[in-house]
Amino acid sequence: MKGDRLVIRELNKNLGLLLVTINQYFLHARILKNWGFEELGEHFFKQSIVEMKAADDLIERILFLEGLPNLQELGKLLIGESTEEIIACDLTKEQEKHEALLAAIATAEAQQDYVSRDLLEKQKDTNEEHIDWLETQQELIGKIGLPNYLQTAAQED
């Protein structure tokens, strides 16, 4: 099925952001694990898998619309050098993705591509959950202090 070029462009923009986020979460997971924060590292690792599945969904949709998934135009990774920076960098990236998702949803709606819109809406819901989790981590650090937060982050299941 030949898709609308504007929708395909928006899907590719979101795909690029997801690909960056996959790498960012994965690297942060490994950094945190290396620092001894097993539980927190595991959360970020699982998050990278969630992002990978979302990217796969976009790739399949772009191909279905007879577009070419663009896996080459990648943005900049935001890599934190402390736990607080890691959380802040990932929150910034998730907020960037949120803005792109809203634009893509509006384009899909305007072009009457309701399947793409629904896919993007689902990804927006997941994105908002990620934003909420990251904001909660920042609030926890503010309330209980970084040393106490890191103590809980180091625990293994």
From Swiss-Prot:
The keyword Metal-binding applies. Residues 1-145 form the Ferritin-like diiron domain. Binds 1 heme b (iron(II)-protoporphyrin IX) group per dimer. GO terms for biological process: intracellular iron ion homeostasis; iron ion transport. Keywords: Heme, Iron, Iron storage, Metal-binding. Gene3D superfamilies: 1.20.1260.10. GO terms for molecular function: ferric iron binding; ferroxidase activity; heme binding; iron ion binding. It comes from the Bacteria. One of its GO terms (cellular component) is cytosol. Heme b binds at residue 52. Fe cation binds at residues 51, 94, 130. CDD domains: Bacterioferritin (cd00907). Its cofactor is heme b. Heterooligomer of 24 subunits, arranged as 12 dimers, that are packed together to form an approximately spherical molecule with a central cavity, in which large amounts of iron can be deposited. Iron-storage protein, plays a role in protection against oxidative stress. Belongs to the bacterioferritin family. This is Bacterioferritin B.
